[in-house]
Amino acid sequence: MTVPHIPRGPVMADIAAFRLTEEEKQRLLDPAIGGIILFRRNFQNIEQLKTLTAEIKALRTPELIIAVDHEGGRVQRFIEGFTRLPAMNVLGQIWDKDGASAAETAAGQVGRVLATELSACGIDLSFTPVLDLDWGNCAVIGNRSFHRNPEAVARLALALQKGLAKGGMKSCGKHFPGHGFVEGDSHLVLPEDGRSLDELEAADLAPFRIMSREGMAAVMPAHVVYPQVDTKPAGFSEIWLKQILRRDIGFKGVIFSDDLTMEGACGAGGIKERARISFEAGCDIVLVCNRPDLVDELRDGFTIPDNQDLAGRWQYMENSLGHEAVQAVMQTMGFQAAQAFVAGLASPQDTAGGVKVGEAF
């Protein structure tokens, strides 16, 4: 059977269960689609996951990019057979107790284990690290944040990024320019952060600047309004994405929208309007999750935006470890020691640091 050559489009969709239905196969062959995000509902066990990712990748060439939210703590989509990952604030606690060096070493090990285990199952990308500061206000962020100190967040995120690279994965910093100060959960409401740009620059933006300089591959903006900067949510704002992120910070990587079905995005209109505004603001790729009907509505008559960088940016997000290489790494004593170390950092309290996120439970 000839695999069709279909360039990756700018939409990331999802699927319902453990295997692809015929309807989903046809949807994923649409030129609008370039990637797929998996959730806990798509995971039964490791062998099933490997079969699913192979099935997805066999549909077309270049292969669809497969992503997942797999941060640790409350946001770890795959559990059985995977190392239980700590919430990121555990690394911040190590920073406070044992110092920066110990915390950075731990963060590197977490990133390495996280990425290698996903790579072994055919996953290209985890949407991590969270760069939001822990201001103590936002339950949906909570212990997903490394720390309140911008330097600690940046250094721990950079160490995690280096670990991810050892496991074949790129990084995606979120939620630009910072979701940690607001109380509202943008899955449910459209939060507002009333601080000035100078205040944001002095704290929340610092990790994004540092990580951008250090090779962060992707960014996901927040569905949060910062009215002193722009009346539009960051993910719909040319000021935030084209002027501040691209021009001022100098970020060259991929901009993924956060899920366009979240309540924080719904005020922009229907799904076609949300996507149009996202692309015009500067997003390369939009996520449409948990609503296949909206994916179908979006792709009906969809015109792929003119983005000369899209193909290269998608390609850059591909996993860099081949199957044989990752299997060999998994068998080494060093990697198995890293798994044991990371598992020892996790505890039941890691899942209790705030509300559930998407499909975290």
From Swiss-Prot:
Keyword terms: Cell cycle, Cell division, Cell shape, Cell wall biogenesis/degradation, Cytoplasm, Glycosidase, Hydrolase, Peptidoglycan synthesis
Positions of substrate binding: D69, R77, R144, K174, H175
The keyword Magnesium is annotated on this UniProt entry: no
Any one GO biological process: cell division
Catalytic-site annotation from UniProt: H187, D258
GO CC term, one of those recorded: cytoplasm
Localisation: Cytoplasm
The protein's Enzyme Commission number: 3.2.1.52
InterPro entries in alphabetical order: Beta_hexosaminidase_bac, Glyco_hydro_3_AS, Glyco_hydro_3_N, Glyco_hydro_3_N_sf, Glycoside_hydrolase_SF, NagZ_Beta-hexosaminidase
Alphabetized GO MF terms: beta-N-acetylhexosaminidase activity
Residues with site note (Important for catalytic activity): D185
Residue ranges of the TM segments: none
Pathway(s) served: Cell wall biogenesis; peptidoglycan recycling
One Pfam family matching this protein: Glyco_hydro_3
Family note: Belongs to the glycosyl hydrolase 3 family. NagZ subfamily.
Known role: Plays a role in peptidoglycan recycling by cleaving the terminal beta-1,4-linked N-acetylglucosamine (GlcNAc) from peptide-linked peptidoglycan fragments, giving rise to free GlcNAc, anhydro-N-acetylmuramic acid and anhydro-N-acetylmuramic acid-linked peptides.
Protein's UniProt name: Beta-hexosaminidase
Organism: Neisseria gonorrhoeae (strain ATCC 700825 / FA 1090)
Lineage summary: Bacteria, Pseudomonadati, Pseudomonadota, Betaproteobacteria, Neisseriales
Gene giving rise to this polypeptide: nagZ
